[in-house]
């Protein structure tokens, strides 16, 4: 487990991505980092991820005034900004396992005190070959957050309060 940091950061050509729709922009940027995936796969995965589930508003810039915009990050399926990563990651995991000919079950462990749990459960629910267990502190989430996690449907999910 842990976090991975690249040895160097690729330079993103801002002019090349200006004007792209969010799924295209996401695929272009992610492709700079995840070079083991084909650009075609990333484009398809981003389109599938940020399309209908985000109501056509992934990366929506809401005008505040003539020159000020607000980036709205709550248009995902759980209304949490974490949907942006946790809806794409399962597709990346399944593709990586396929490319590496890995067939064993994968267990995702998540610890949360709030929105991450629901976003992770929603993203990974019913993904073949993947189990997810979400741990949360008893009394450490809001009642709404607890209910969001507890009512998530899926055959491969475990929710554990500690």
Question: What name fits each language-model region?
Answer:
Residues 69-126:
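Well-ordered mid-protein domain cores that form the structural environment of catalytic cofactors
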Residues 160-162:
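Conserved small/polar residues in nucleotide/adenosyl-binding loops
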Residues 133-144, 154:
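Hydrophobic, small-residue-rich alpha-helical packing segments that form membrane-like cores
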Residues 69, 131, 156-158:
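Conserved beta-strand segments of alpha/beta enzyme cores
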Residues 4-79:
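N-terminal entrance/gating region of PLP-dependent enzymes' catalytic architecture
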């Amino acid at each position: 487990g842990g976090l991975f940091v690249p040895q160097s950061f690729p330079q993103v050509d801002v002019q090349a991505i200006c004007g792209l729709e969010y799924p295209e922009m996401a695929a272009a940027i992610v492709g700079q980092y995840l070079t083991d995936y084909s650009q075609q796969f990333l484009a398809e995965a981003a389109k599938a991820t940020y399309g209908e589930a985000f109501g056509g508003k992934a990366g929506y810039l809401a005008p505040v005034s003539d020159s000020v915009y607000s980036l709205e990050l709550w248009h995902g399926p759980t209304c949490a900004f974490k949907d942006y990563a946790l809806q794409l990651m399962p597709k990346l995991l399944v593709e990586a396992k396929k490319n590496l000919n890995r067939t064993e079950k994968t267990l995702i462990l998540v610890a949360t005190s709030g929105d991450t749990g629901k976003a992770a459960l929603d993203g990974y629910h019913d993904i073949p070959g993947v189990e997810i267990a979400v741990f949360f502190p008893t009394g450490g989430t809001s009642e709404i957050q607890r209910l969001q996690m507890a009512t998530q449907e899926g055959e491969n999910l475990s929710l554990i309060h500690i």
